[in-house]
Amino acid sequence: MNIVVLGAGIIGVSTAWHLLQAGHEVTLVDRQSEAAQETSFANAAQISVSYCEPWANKDAPLKALKWMFSDEAPLLFRPQFPIGKGWHQYRWGLQFLANCNDTAFERNVAQIVALGRYSHEALKNVVAQTGIEYQRLEKGIAHIFTDERAFAAAGDAAELMRRHGVDRKLVSTQELLRIEPAFQRFASRIVGGTYTASDESGDAREFTCQLAQRCGQLGARLLFNHDVIGLNKVGNTIDSVALRAQKTGQTSALSADAVVIACGSYSAPLLRTVGVNLPV
């Protein structure tokens, strides 16, 4: 198949790589001058299957209400008016609330953990195949707590992860200091922590840029500095992507048997133009 992948972040490039491995013809499109220039440029660097509890839980609605009045809140919902203009925001909010119960939480945890473990194995396979160097550290990930109540809650979360096969465990302050001696300078404030030996870290940008180069070497067409201006649909099928070259302003239609949308937060508005409502 002739497949067009929109977005050259870590998701788009990884998708392109696996499609090439499966024997497809791939064109990778991005508006930036090279891969990993937006969401994948600088992130937390964590590859942490053990921290994948969904934000939608029974305590989230009350917390979200409190957070609405804080500019530093981890979850913000800023209502758009008129409602008709931002209907997708309210639709997302209702879907979020519908998942704020124990039944949905357990179901979602199981699905996210399964996806995370699968993704982690896929990453290991790509690294083994390519030998990509991206400042990878396989030393696990530790989180520290300075509040007793938060530490107690972390114990419940760790137990939940262990039920799903993830090796996240509670550790004492002394165990934390053995894992990472740098914590010593503020050890008196630490009440405990969690540690997951199977988690790791690395530079997402380095990984993505190198994998994009490998995609090009395998025959992928890399179209950087191109804006996506539309999706062309015939019936229920997207058969081409409308592009504009930034350098010349020339527009073109890129034909495809299939299109992968990996544009981060821009995916939802792009797909709405063809009647697909992505809850992102």
What are these regions (language model features)?
Residues 8, 13, 174, 226, ...:
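Structural detector for helix-capping/boundary residues
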Residues 39, 45-86, 217-218, 231-280:
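Flavin-dependent oxidoreductases
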Residues 11, 34, 266:
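Conserved Rossmann-like nucleotide-cofactor binding loop
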Residues 24-25, 166, 220, 276:
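Short phosphate-binding/catalytic loops that engage adenosine nucleotides
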Residues 2-28:
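N-terminal Rossmann-like FAD-binding beta1-loop-alpha1 element of flavoenzymes
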Residues 44-174:
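Dinucleotide-binding Rossmann-like beta1-alpha1 core, especially the glycine-rich loop
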Residues 21-41:
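Glycine-rich FAD pyrophosphate-binding loop
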Residues 152-164, 184-258, 262, 266:
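Helical element adjacent to the flavin cofactor pocket in flavoenzyme catalytic cores
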